[in-house]
UniProtKB/Swiss-Prot annotation:
It is an enzyme of class 2 (transferase). The gene is argB. Its main location: cytoplasm. This is Acetylglutamate kinase. InterPro entries: AceGlu_kinase-like_sf, AcgluKinase_fam, ArgB, Asp/Glu/Uridylate_kinase, NAGK-NC. Pathway: Amino-acid biosynthesis; L-arginine biosynthesis; N(2)-acetyl-L-ornithine from L-glutamate: step 2/4. The lineage of its organism: Bacteria, Pseudomonadati, Pseudomonadota, Gammaproteobacteria, Enterobacterales. One of its GO terms (molecular function) is acetylglutamate kinase activity.
């Protein structure tokens, strides 16, 4: 089996029918013409935010990570492992793709521990066992994995989806693409930066050009590139016609170098 490709979905993608249609059409095209197995990893911040708003619950973030109190983890699990995951499975079904919905704890695919007590039920993801997902891939299934995990003590944890995707890529020896709303990392003039090193990223963070959630994304991509020992791409789902080329390893967004 070829080494898999993990496509991490983020941003408002889950909220946009047009975006999902583009993505799944590209996945169908890719799967028809390539043997390479694919895995989807997703968060669903927008789904969680909508639900929290509807329930009048505050959304609090610390350094770009969502604070998850004990009384909110069940709600967030329902939004990510439930609504967001099953929405993606429904789109796969609509496009005749045989998909299986999972969370990080299934088959112990990604090991999760509590990151920081101050953040509550927020997990740190580390590589686990490739056995379950490899079995699914060998049988032609598309695993769709939410970023909810569980500790050895049985505590549910909300994991940053970029970091979850990195841990799963390390588990499977997979390549990784982080798909988001933006076409990559932008410089101070709004122009896409084609390649990024750790030194360049540090410089742009110091200058205030890379901020907030993008800092988490860039650090996750740098961490992924270091962990995996190979480049990681940050790119946009908006240009559907470019997605098959992107899945084939053509740089379309910002390539994070080791």
């Amino acid at each position: 089996m070829m080494n898999p490709l993990i496509i991490k979905l983020g941003g408002v993608l889950l909220d946009s029918e047009e975006a999902l249609e583009r993505l799944f059409s590209a996945l169908v095209n890719y799967r028809e013409s390539h043997q390479r197995p694919l895995v989807i990893v997703h968060g669903g911040g927008c789904v969680v935010d909508e639900l929290m708003k509807g329930l009048n619950l505050p959304v609090k973030k610390k350094n770009g990570l969502r604070v998850t109190p004990a009384d909110q983890i069940d709600i967030i699990t329902g939004a990510l492992a439930g609504t967001a995951n099953k929405t993606l499975l429904a789109w796969a079904k609509k496009h005749q793709i045989a998909a299986v919905g999972l969370f990080l704890g299934d088959g112990d695919s990604v090991k999760v521990t509590q990151l920081d007590e101050e953040l509550g039920h927020v997990g740190l993801a580390q590589p686990g066992s490739p056995k379950l997902i490899n079995t699914l891939l060998e049988n032609g299934y598309l695993p769709v994995v939410s970023s909810i995990g569980v500790t050895d003590e049985g505590q549910l944890m909300n994991v940053n989806a970029d970091q979850a995707a990195t841990a799963l890529a390390a588990t499977l020896g997979a390549d990784l693409i982080l798909l988001s709303d933006v076409s990559g990392i932008l410089d101070g003039k709004g122009q896409r930066i084609a390649e990024m090193t750790a030194a360049k990223a540090e410089q742009l963070i110091e200058q205030g050009i890379i901020t907030d959630g993008m800092i988490v994304k860039v650090n996750a991509a740098l961490d992924a590139a270091r962990t995996l020992g190979r480049p990681v791409d940050i790119a946009s789902w908006r240009h559907a016609e470019q997605l098959p080329a992107l899945f084939n390893g053509m740089p379309m967004g910002t390539r994070i170098l080791v």
